[in-house]
Amino acid sequence: MNRPGGNVTGVSRLAVAIAPKRLELMHELSPKATVIGLLVNPTNPRSELVVNQLEEAARAFGIRLHILKVSTEDKLESAFASLVQLGVGALLVAQEPSYFRWREQIIALAAHHAIPATYGQREYPAAGGLMSYDASGADSFRQVGLYRILKGEKPVDLPVIQPIKFELVINLKTAKALSIEVPPTLLARTDEVIE
């Protein structure tokens, strides 16, 4: 996708490609969790790709992945109740526009059920979620070709840029509430700590 042509340019977020890294980070934070839930929206075409990548990564870590397919907000409570019934030790929330809109409810349900969860955007731990890992928004915006377009370059001549900087954000207050001690090795790699 170096030069997609037409009027297309921008920055790829790599939401599917970095999902296994989120699983790895959650495994490092909660190594005793042998069953991890994955919240995905089945109406999102990327969901199947995310599930496939995470199932492969989960096998490598000796983790069983439990897939929760939720496409409407009213199904969130029952999805979290099923996590508890299945003894799920942690949760990955897929990057999904509707989940981002529902983030306060998702964070509240994770806290209510004492389920450590990792998310795809820093806004989740900023709002009380445990952890996020994603391409740096600030770095991505700096890479965007908008400024070049405003200077007269044509979008057709600009590549779609892959992110080069990723950020790990951990909310220590939430970790403490969940009785999770963040390993020093993970804390040392954290880009932003929320206390």
Model regions: which residues?
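Short hydrophobic alpha-helices and adjacent helix-cap/hinge residues
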Residues: M1-E195
